[in-house]
Amino acid sequence: MALRIEDKKAIVAEVAEQVSSALSAAVADYRGLTVNQMTSLRKQARESGVYLRVVRNNLARLAIKGTEFECLADALKGPLVLALSKDEPGAAAKLFKNFQKDHNAFEVKNLAMSGELFGPEKLDDFAKLPTREEALATLLNIMQAPVTKFVRTLNEIPSQAVRVFAAVGDSK
């Protein structure tokens, strides 16, 4: 069924709004998937905070125009599903990677982040990106390490003095 111009404008506006707040994007070919498999993918996307939409390529091009994901414009060919990571930069890649394990017909085409276009070979790298909490925990550990080491060194001085006095006392 053909879309009316109002419907097309609404779709472009919705996708453009989601793109404006996205951290990363992934595009995949969904040919060969059943309706139940696509429904499962959509459910997993909702659970992981990923915006997922099957959108016509021309409408997607209009939605990403002027954004950091404009680099995807030339990659939009054929029937594609667009996934946008909203909270975590690697969420869409993780979703696609996990889904691709069980569904051979599902093929990731491109990934984009910070205005750069990446091929499907970078899917594993994107999927391994830490969550915000993991990144903050790592940063905190790095920042605490010198302080912790300094405190241990300060505590070692009185401990050594006590051991020296104990050794002197034992020798007499």
Swiss-Prot record:
GO terms, biological process: translation
Annotated Pfam families: Ribosomal_L10 (PF00466)
RNA-binding listed as a keyword: yes
RNA-binding as UniProt keyword: yes
Gene Ontology CC entries for this record: ribonucleoprotein complex; ribosome
Molecular function terms from GO: large ribosomal subunit rRNA binding
Keywords: Ribonucleoprotein, Ribosomal protein, RNA-binding, rRNA-binding
Subunit (UniProt): Part of the ribosomal stalk of the 50S ribosomal subunit. The N-terminus interacts with L11 and the large rRNA to form the base of the stalk. The C-terminus forms an elongated spine to which L12 dimers bind in a sequential fashion forming a multimeric L10(L12)X complex.
Similarity comment text for this entry: Belongs to the universal ribosomal protein uL10 family.
Function: Forms part of the ribosomal stalk, playing a central role in the interaction of the ribosome with GTP-bound translation factors.
HAMAP family: Ribosomal_uL10
Protein name in the entry: Large ribosomal subunit protein uL10
Species classification: Bacteria, Pseudomonadati, Pseudomonadota, Gammaproteobacteria, Thiotrichales
